């Protein structure tokens, strides 16, 4: 059975991800107590269901300590994938304010208070980060701070299409002016490269458009940086495999996330596609949804 566990921070998009999996034919359960999961998997397998998606968050805090061992045990019998959704505190506060929802932990007494004061939203978010942090190491992390819901749904569908027998390498382009991604294992700053933005004909385009591709591809310094990053990754990918890593996110950042970082992410994804299963995602570039997150084959 394929089991997808969705966890992370409240407000980071777990409901959106779960809905995307339901549309893909998964049997979906929100906030299932972890200890019930093995029994549910056995029951569904007996009933002929082969795809299960479960969202787990801090509302199950009493059982979160069981999750690492539970994931290992389930992985011996099933194809288990863990998706850990994260977002910046600022983005989460804005989302809770817009929806007027209450954070699951906001009604708990503050650890620092001698009386029964309720914690602030920011305190609740930070407490939840501590509770769910051990689960992050088991799956792929994705920063949804700057993701639209439709882009997240597209990315989740790409995520479940990946084979589970190899390390998945994700190249993510971004713009520093919108903040650094929280989900990056490695981050490369390419702002030292010539910027197509200063060419008025190239400014409205992206690193996916042929005129920008031609501009950057003609520069030796761009190829030097590409070669250096590729050499580093090719050297260290075997070590990550030996460490049983399932996912590795490489973030490529330029000023706005529109030209240079997009071109380099695309080029590196193509170069490394024979070394690993590859996903490329463009966080900040104004591109179509189907181009913002895709598999590289």
Swiss-Prot record:
The organism's superkingdom is given as Bacteria
Q: Does the keyword ATP-binding apply?
A: yes
Keyword set, alphabetical order: ATP-binding, GTP-binding, Nucleotide-binding
Q: SUPFAM superfamilies, from UniProt?
A: P-loop containing nucleoside triphosphate hydrolases
Instruction: Please indicate if the UniProt record lists Nucleotide-binding as a keyword.
Output: yes
Tell me which Pfam families the record gives.
PapZ_C, RapZ-like_N
| Amino-acid positions noted as binding ATP in the UniProt annotation, renumbered to this chain | 8-15
An example Gene Ontology molecular-function term: GTP binding
Question: Which residues make up the binding site for GTP?
Answer: 57-60
Q: Which residues form a coiled coil?
A: none
Q: Which InterPro entries match?
A: P-loop_NTPase (IPR027417), RapZ-like (IPR005337), RapZ-like_N (IPR053930), RapZ_C (IPR053931)
Per the entry, what this protein does is: Displays ATPase and GTPase activities.
Give the protein family.
Answer: Belongs to the RapZ-like family.
Q: Which PANTHER family match?
A: RNASE ADAPTER PROTEIN RAPZ
Please give the name of this protein: Nucleotide-binding protein BPSL0529
List the source organism: Burkholderia pseudomallei (strain K96243)
């Amino acid at each position: 059975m394929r089991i997808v566990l969705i966890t992370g921070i409240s407000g980071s998009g777990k409901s959106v991800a779960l809905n995307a999996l339901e549309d893909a034919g998964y049997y979906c359960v929100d906030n299932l107590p972890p200890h019930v999961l093995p029994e549910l998997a056995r029951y569904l397998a007996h009933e002929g269901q082969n795809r299960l998606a479960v969202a787990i968050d801090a509302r199950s805090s009493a059982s979160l300590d069981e999750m690492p061992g539970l994931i290992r045990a389930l992985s011996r019998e099933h194809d288990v994938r863990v998706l850990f959704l994260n977002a910046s505190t600022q983005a989460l506060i804005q989302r809770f304010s817009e929806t007027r929802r209450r954070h699951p932990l906001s009604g708990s007494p503050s650890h620092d208070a001698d009386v029964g004061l309720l914690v602030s939203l920011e305190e609740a978010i930070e407490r939840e980060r501590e509770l769910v942090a051990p689960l992050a190491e088991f799956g792929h992390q994705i920063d949804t701070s700057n993701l639209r819901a439709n882009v997240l749904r597209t990315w989740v569908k790409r995520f479940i299409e990946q084979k589970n027998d190899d390390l998945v390498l994700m190249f993510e382009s971004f713009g520093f002016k919108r903040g650094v991604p929280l989900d990056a294992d490695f981050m490369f700053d390419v702002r030292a490269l010539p910027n197509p933005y200063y060419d008025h004909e190239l400014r409205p385009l992206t690193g996916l458009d042929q005129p920008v591709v031609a501009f950057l591809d003609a520069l030796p310094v761009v190829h030097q940086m590409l070669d250096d990053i590729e050499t580093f990754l090719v050297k260290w990918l075997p070590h990550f495999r030996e460490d049983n890593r399932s996912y590795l996110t490489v973030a490529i950042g330029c000023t706005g996330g529109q030209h240079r970082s997009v071109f380099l992410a695309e080029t590196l994804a193509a170069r490394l596609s024979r070394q690993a299963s590859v996903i490329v995602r463009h966080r900040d570039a104004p591109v179509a949804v189907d181009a913002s997150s895709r598999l590289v084959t």
